[in-house]
Amino acid sequence: MRVMIVDDSAVVRGMVTRWLEEAGFIIAAIAVDGGQALRKLADTSVDVCLLDIEMPVMSGLEALPKLLAAKPDLRVIMASTLTERGAEVTLRALDLGAADYIAKPSANKLGGADLYRKDLIEKVRHLGARAARPAPPQAAPRPTLAPPSSDPAGPIEAVVVASSTGGPPALRRFIAGLGADWTSPILIAQHMPPGFTRTLAQMLDPISHLTAREAQNGEPIVPGVIYVAPGDYHMTVRAAGGGGPSIHLDQGPEVNYCRPSADPLFESAARFWKGRVLGVVLTGMGRDGRDGAAVLAKVGGTIIAQDEATSVVWGMPGAVANAGLAEAVLPLDQIGPYIASRARSVA
């Protein structure tokens, strides 16, 4: 697997080169800015590019669309800072076609560099493996449908969503596909650090008539709202004093190496709404959401998984599909309309 490193810091270039070479990757090219990266890409075979956002001459955000125009199948990982501006620029980059991002460790965070190294190696390995596969056929993939595990338990009172790598752009398209009549609350566990999730909610807010916001502990869950789990917090559903659903946030142990994790969200939603909740598992690495989907399916809830062809990484949805938990395995743009149609049929 061939990697290009683009960063204006000699220290970062040297450190990342050493890490990736020790992990068995080939460093095909190294560049100090976006312009140099474009010139090197013209005569170098590259599978994955680690692209810094803030650089002189040509920034990562400026270079990204040019790199993808030159090599459409290039998998780009944006290297971002854990700041509000870093979050905004990163989400813009994901919309422009970046496959993923990695948050640079803060200097005062104990063990930050080691976690960064492990995260980087995992992302490069998964994205590089995807880039090495043959391109999917141009024809639209056919959806895989399975019979429902049980009869619909009544109207869909809520939707819970799991997403990770490639999730922000996928969430935009999924929400847009629900249509103007959708009112049931949507609860999202997207793997992102603190600060990024607030920016994600702001990005999702204008997509539809629904109000999107970062969830707050104890607030009631009401129709017409999209709740995004804050970074570094698990989000679950609990009964409020009057018996209605409310948001509970906690910093319990990571689940599937994640916080927020989809499994606690799905499991708590299954306990509260039983079969009247629908789970959606979108693109992402790992298997987060699989165990929660199993709990949800056991009480009669419905699970929809994104298909492999439209996923950046078919880890999470693949785990659900391969476990036989999904009623439907669909291309991304079919998920929203499918759910909206299903909701109308049981209303």
UniProtKB/Swiss-Prot annotation:
Active-site residues, record numbering mapped to chain: 164, 191, 288
Spans annotated as Disordered: 131-153
InterPro entries linked: CheB-like (IPR008248), CheB_C (IPR035909), CheY-like_superfamily (IPR011006), Sig_transdc_resp-reg_Me-estase (IPR000673), Sig_transdc_resp-reg_receiver (IPR001789)
SMART domains: REC (SM00448)
Processing after translation: Phosphorylated by CheA. Phosphorylation of the N-terminal regulatory domain activates the methylesterase activity.
An MF annotation (GO) of this entry: protein-glutamate methylesterase activity
Comp. bias regions, Pro residues: 134-150
Keywords attached to this entry: Chemotaxis, Cytoplasm, Hydrolase, Phosphoprotein
The CheB-type methylesterase domain, residue ranges: 152-346
UniProt subcellular location: Cytoplasm
UniProt keyword Isomerase, yes or no: no
Enzyme class: hydrolase
PROSITE patterns: CHEB, RESPONSE_REGULATORY
GO cellular component: cytoplasm
Modified-residue entries (4-aspartylphosphate), positions: 52
Enzyme Commission code: 3.1.1.61, 3.5.1.44
One GO-annotated biological process of the protein: chemotaxis
Principal location: cytoplasm
Function: Involved in chemotaxis. Part of a chemotaxis signal transduction system that modulates chemotaxis in response to various stimuli. Catalyzes the demethylation of specific methylglutamate residues introduced into the chemoreceptors (methyl-accepting chemotaxis proteins or MCP) by CheR. Also mediates the irreversible deamidation of specific glutamine residues to glutamic acid.
Similarity comment text for this entry: Belongs to the CheB family.
Protein name as catalogued: Protein-glutamate methylesterase/protein-glutamine glutaminase 2
Gene this chain is encoded by: cheB2
